[in-house]
Amino acid sequence: MSFEGARLSMRSRRNGTLGSTRTLYSSVSRSTDVSYSESDLVNFIQANFKKRECVFFTRDSKAMESICKCGYAQSQHIEGTQINQNEKWNYKKHTKEFPTDAFGDIQFETLGKKGKYLRLSCDTDSETLYELLTQHWHLKTPNLVISVTGGAKNFALKPRMRKIFSRLIYIAQSKGAWILTGGTHYGLMKYIGEVVRDNTISRNSEENIVAIGIAAWGMVSNRDTLIRNCDDEGHFSAQYIMDDFMRDPLYILDNNHTHLLLVDNGCHGHPTVEAKLRNQLEKYISERTSQDSNYGGKIPIVCFAQGGGRETLKAINTSVKSKIPCVVVEGSGQIADVIASLVEVEDVLTSSMVKEKLVRFLPRTVSRLPEEEIESWIKWLKEILESPHLLTVIKMEEAGDEVVSSAISYALYKAFSTNEQDKDNWNGQLKLLLEWNQLDLASDEIFTNDRRWESADLQEVMFTALIKDRPKFVRLFLENGLNLQKFLTNEVLTELFSTHFSTLVYRNLQIAKNSYNDALLTFVWKLVANFRRSFWKEDRSSREDLDVELHDASLTTRHPLQALFIWAILQNKKELSKVIWEQTKGCTLAALGASKLLKTLAKVKNDINAAGESEELANEYETRAVELFTECYSSDEDLAEQLLVYSCEAWGGSNCLELAVEATDQHFIAQPGVQNFLSKQWYGEISRDTKNWKIILCLFIIPLVGCGLVSFRKKPIDKHKKLLWYYVAFFTSPFVVFSWNVVFYIAFLLLFAYVLLMDFHSVPHTPELILYALVFVLFCDEVRQWYMNGVNYFTDLWNVMDTLGLFYFIAGIVFRLHSSNKSSLYSGRVIFCLDYIIFTLRLIHIFTVSRNLGPKIIMLQRMLIDVFFFLFLFAVWMVAFGVARQGILRQNEQRWRWIFRSVIYEPYLAMFGQVPSDVDSTTYDFSHCTFSGNESKPLCVELDEYNLPRFPEWITIPLVCIYMLSTNILLVNLLVAMFGYTVGIVQENNDQVWKFQRYFLVQEYCNRLNIPFPFVVFAYFYMVVKKCFKCCCKEKNTESSACCFRNEDNETLAWEGVMKENYLVKINTKANDNAEEMRHRFRQLDTKLNDLKGLLKEIANKIK
């Protein structure tokens, strides 16, 4: 039966008790902390590892020369060897153990490859050998052992088989596995070594692949070079020669294996000597208990077989008897195909049936075997097939990247689940499938209807699924009873944020926090730092970090789901974060918070690819927020609007609107539901149906407010105070406040212009004093905004203009009031005039309220940035031309003013068409210049001996032409193209851009005091006095945070949870519909192809 067929035919297991393992399975094994010196290694090897020498010479009657049955000549035996006649040779009787003399490092000549090797007796204890590998050769404890067998002779490797081997090596590298092979440079072992080499080079991994070759010492060619000299007591490096042209039956060692174990039984030229020791080592490792293993506390081992003959068959037989699962590659030929074909037989297996398969797949081999040997083969095959659960077959033609790993994991699972000791260890089985990411097996075989899982049973595997980024398993555990709220204890979160949190991410987060310094980034950084502070306490060099703690330590315990979501988001765990997001409360807020974090981190990441991934994930969460809010708004507008202003301390105390704006999520802000909410804020209690001209008219004729000209969204409760309520509702509307401010500002500009043009005297008159008072009110308002916004105040261009205008005005007052001389008075007036420009340009801000003019302001702002970069390019041409022109025409001009005019000013004017007239000698006018340089004229050009201009016209005129061509045509058109691109970008998102900018205007006037200018100054004085009083009395705010605990919040979040489920159902339905549509299209295409094929056949028949 094939791998897929066997997998589908497995029956569900009955319930059992969960075993427990102390630690989680890790793909990176732990190596011993004990370090050994070279002398300790030599002493250990010489004390525990032996070689075998034949001590009885038994002549081989079949040999032509005087050769012992051990394979060595008599001269090659040690001194004192006894001579026997016609006695059957046995290594236990006729050989003796001596301390090994071949071990150390092996250097393959001309290839530069190094590895370790050891000659050891075939009776070496497996425990001692394992100790050598792990503690003295410092190999990490394997998480998996893959024993590869088959095809010991040279053969042409098929491309499909090479791909399978490549995937096998990748699995070994990623899982921290050992690969065991025959270790020679022939057949399968040679190809395995080449794939190991290619993967090591291409992946450039710090974790080297461990490939252990176990070969027979007596079959190794050039083995004399491996023997140490008698005086070599320490480190020894053998220079091994790989002679591929040798024709003797001996093998050369493979240069791509990292470790070589050369098994010695005292004979020469006898193959398969190493099989016994290899089988014992595999069995020992498979039975060895490891704390890091997911295989019931044991190290998993699997036999991987392809092709092969007698020895491969024996190796598979031995593995099956040792309860080691085997993966057989069907299509690789020989014994592997025999086993694959017999696995699929459902009838009773008979000897004739087995022999038929042998003859079919190994005709030449079977024809040369005696009948007794064939019976042995049949017996071994029957023994193998008595344990079909230990056999997994994959087809070579269908073996893709995932098939090999799935086959290995499936083989391990079948062996584990059918083992008498482990078949009820559901926890161990689940860990195994989790490690290999086999979700389907876990769903079909473990999470069945006949077993009920407790939340505590799944907590350990849930933690593993989180750190290994297994989102599908996380979802599976949640669907089967895991309580995420109970699972996320403070200890679990501390482990996640400290041990399983990237240091690079933490540094980027700290950089972002310092660069942008907003509430969310500060909160998240403190959250992470709070979990990591135990590690910082060990670093005394950074004591300032010890003070980084959350003000409320219980915050993370109140919002563990949000903390876990932040952990996943910061590390770009895309699918995992989506699973966790579905479990959180306040999903809309969480999605916008994720978008904000990811976009901010993307700005500080040096890796372009990582930054792009963060941007992509941020856009996905913005889309989720948009779609979920649309779902909510279509169901209930009022509750959806409550979601917009719902804030949570887990997201820095920000609400949805604030996070969306900070993340520049224009798509979210442009949603109809959000815009309707902003419109309600903008008009306040005034009905949106009221025409704007009616509101403006009521500003000038106030009694009309109570005459019904303006309609309101609701009626006053107290009818006796109806008129008062109308006036209060009208004048507290942000739109009315805005309109009144516009009227006031226009009046202010008119007064400013009147003072500058008609009433500016040495002693200020009444209009000018009123102007000072109005500017003081504006100054108070800017101080209030700065106090409320803090550092973020200067991130707004309009605030920068306001500040600049006020400072200019103060400077103008200083000069203007210092009127002891006319020069100072004039300077003050000039400053006032320049300041008037700033105040007038500030009027542009009011146009953002217009749907048509608002985007145009954005275009102007972005085009100013284009002009800024354009000036850098233009400056290159301008300075190059200006300096060259001045140097050619004039000599030693000392006046900086005229140098500036000639080098900068005149070339700048040339861009607008004013051609320089001093580059043509025929039109040069000496009356407009000076030779002495002491007049208010430019310096005349240098003259020659004939009193004619010295400069060569064949240089100056072409120079002007080239400059005019470059600036007036190339650069100006480049600027026009830049403007066109900028306008196009804004125009594409015209509506979104305006709606996004509208938010700032609405919030600005919603946060203002609802008192008309300039009377608001009295409210400012009141606020200052109140603040001073609080500071003097040292009043403290004792209100505790009620975040997420108010009834209205709980009701809103519960309703949002229902809407979220509806939204997820729609997404999944849409995805299924798309998949079904694709399948339908493929079926239609297949039908058309079949019809076309039939038509072509008919045409071919007609032609014939």
UniProtKB/Swiss-Prot annotation:
Q: Which residues lie within the membrane without crossing it?
A: 896-912
GO process annotations (BP): calcium ion transmembrane transport; calcium ion transport; intracellular calcium ion homeostasis; positive regulation of cold-induced thermogenesis; response to cold; response to temperature stimulus; thermoception
Tissue note? Expressed in dorsal root and trigeminal ganglia. Specifically expressed in a subset of sensory neurons, including cold-sensitive neurons in trigeminal neurons.
Q: What keywords sit in the KW lines?
A: Calcium, Cell membrane, Coiled coil, Ion channel, Ion transport, Membrane, Metal-binding, Sensory transduction, Transmembrane, Transmembrane helix, Transport
How is this protein positioned relative to the membrane? Multi-pass membrane protein
Grouped into one coarse class, the protein's main location is membrane
The residues on the Extracellular side of the membrane are 759-765, 818-822, 891-895, 913-953
| GO annotations of cellular component type | external side of plasma membrane; membrane; membrane raft; plasma membrane; plasma membrane raft
Bilayer-crossing regions: 734-758, 766-789, 797-817, 823-848, 854-890, 954-984
Localization, UniProt: Cell membrane; Membrane raft
All ranges on the Cytoplasmic side of the membrane: 1-733, 790-796, 849-853, 985-1104
List the residue ranges forming a coiled coil, or say none: 1067-1104
Disulfide pairings: none
InterPro entries reported in the protein's UniProt record: Ion_trans_dom, TRPM, TRPM_SLOG
Q: Which GO terms describe its molecular function?
A: calcium channel activity; identical protein binding; ligand-gated calcium channel activity; metal ion binding; monoatomic ion channel activity
How is this chain's activity regulated?
Activated by cold temperatures and by both natural and synthetic cooling compounds such as menthol and icilin. Activation of the channel requires the presence of PI(4,5)P2; PI(4,5)P2 is necessary to gate the channel. Activated by intracellular Ca(2+).
Q: How does it assemble?
A: Homotetramer. Interacts (via N-terminus and C-terminus domains) with TCAF1; the interaction stimulates TRPM8 channel activity. Interacts (via N-terminus and C-terminus domains) with TCAF2; the interaction inhibits TRPM8 channel activity.
What is this protein's function? Non-selective ion channel permeable to monovalent and divalent cations, including Na(+), K(+), and Ca(2+), with higher permeability for Ca(2+). Activated by multiple factors, such as temperature, voltage, pressure, and changes in osmolality. Activated by cool temperatures (<23-28 degrees Celsius) and by chemical ligands evoking a sensation of coolness, such as menthol and icilin, therefore plays a central role in the detection of environmental cold temperatures.
Write out the similarity annotation. Belongs to the transient receptor (TC 1.A.4) family. LTrpC subfamily. TRPM8 sub-subfamily.
Give the comment on domains.
The coiled coil region is required for multimerization. Cooling agents bind within a pocket formed entirely by the S1-S4 helices that opens to the cytoplasm.
Q: What is the recorded name of this protein?
A: Transient receptor potential cation channel subfamily M member 8
